[in-house]
């Protein structure tokens, strides 16, 4: 009787552990931090157009080693979390990657972080300045991401962006 009870308890505990465990991929964060307000690309473009905020788009794959290495650095960065409030944040994994060539300006490597203006246009001039020049949108550290976010914020928000954008339309 006690052997059966012990086996039942062990089985129940294992089941409980299985259903309550998480691999850090719940929600739209997909390991990059569920505390950040992530959107789909479609919803993000609509929100950016309505709010005037630029978009930050992360393109990654679930099986990618470099992507897995970046996730905890990104998710644990308080500075990225704070800066994310100034962007519409989009997280695209696996088959969510757009087929549009604008989303792979210098190749289809992963992970890539791209910045889009509020109209949804990819801004290829915003690159990882401290990264490999052959992979301009590849970021390996939270510090690099923060620098990219600050540059994008400077270029894509406020009067400087509106003046440049308005002149482009004339």
Curated annotation (Swiss-Prot):
<feature type="glycosylation site" description="N-linked (GlcNAc...) asparagine">
    <location>
        <position position="128"/>
    </location>
</feature>
<keyword id="KW-0732">Signal</keyword>
<dbReference type="InterPro" id="IPR037462">
    <property type="entry name" value="ERp19"/>
</dbReference>
<keyword id="KW-0676">Redox-active center</keyword>
<feature type="disulfide bond" description="Redox-active">
    <location>
        <begin position="64"/>
        <end position="67"/>
    </location>
</feature>
<keyword id="KW-1015">Disulfide bond</keyword>
<keyword id="KW-0325">Glycoprotein</keyword>
<keyword id="KW-0256">Endoplasmic reticulum</keyword>
<protein>
    <recommendedName>
        <fullName>Thioredoxin domain-containing protein 12</fullName>
        <ecNumber>1.8.4.2</ecNumber>
    </recommendedName>
</protein>
<dbReference type="InterPro" id="IPR017937">
    <property type="entry name" value="Thioredoxin_CS"/>
</dbReference>
<dbReference type="Pfam" id="PF13899">
    <property type="entry name" value="Thioredoxin_7"/>
</dbReference>
<comment type="function">
    <text>Protein-disulfide reductase of the endoplasmic reticulum that promotes disulfide bond formation in client proteins through its thiol-disulfide oxidase activity.</text>
</comment>
<dbReference type="InterPro" id="IPR013766">
    <property type="entry name" value="Thioredoxin_domain"/>
</dbReference>
<dbReference type="GO" id="GO:0015035">
    <property type="term" value="F:protein-disulfide reductase activity"/>
</dbReference>
<dbReference type="GO" id="GO:0005783">
    <property type="term" value="C:endoplasmic reticulum"/>
</dbReference>
<dbReference type="GO" id="GO:1902236">
    <property type="term" value="P:negative regulation of endoplasmic reticulum stress-induced intrinsic apoptotic signaling pathway"/>
</dbReference>
<dbReference type="GO" id="GO:0005788">
    <property type="term" value="C:endoplasmic reticulum lumen"/>
</dbReference>
<dbReference type="InterPro" id="IPR036249">
    <property type="entry name" value="Thioredoxin-like_sf"/>
</dbReference>
<feature type="short sequence motif" description="Prevents secretion from ER">
    <location>
        <begin position="167"/>
        <end position="170"/>
    </location>
</feature>
<keyword id="KW-0560">Oxidoreductase</keyword>
<dbReference type="InterPro" id="IPR051099">
    <property type="entry name" value="AGR/TXD"/>
</dbReference>
<feature type="signal peptide">
    <location>
        <begin position="1"/>
        <end position="24"/>
    </location>
</feature>
<dbReference type="GO" id="GO:0019153">
    <property type="term" value="F:protein-disulfide reductase (glutathione) activity"/>
</dbReference>
């Amino acid at each position: 009787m006690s052997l059966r009870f012990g086996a039942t308890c062990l089985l129940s505990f294992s089941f409980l552990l299985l259903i309550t465990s998480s691999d850090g991929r719940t929600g739209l964060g997909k390991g990059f931090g569920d505390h950040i307000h992530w959107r789909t690309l479609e919803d993000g473009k609509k929100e950016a157009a309505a709010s005037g905020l630029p978009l930050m788009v992360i393109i990654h794959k679930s099986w990618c080693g470099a992507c897995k290495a970046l996730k905890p650095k990104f998710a644990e960065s308080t500075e990225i979390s704070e800066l994310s409030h100034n962007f519409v944040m989009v997280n695209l994994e696996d088959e969510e990657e757009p087929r549009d060539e604008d989303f792979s300006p210098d190749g289809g490597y992963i992970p890539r972080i791209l910045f889009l203006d509020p109209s949804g246009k990819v801004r290829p001039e915003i690159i990882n300045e401290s990264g490999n020049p052959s992979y301009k949108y590849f970021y390996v550290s939270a510090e690099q991401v923060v620098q990219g976010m600050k540059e994008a914020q400077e270029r894509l928000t406020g009067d400087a962006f509106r003046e440049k954008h308005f002149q482009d339309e004339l």
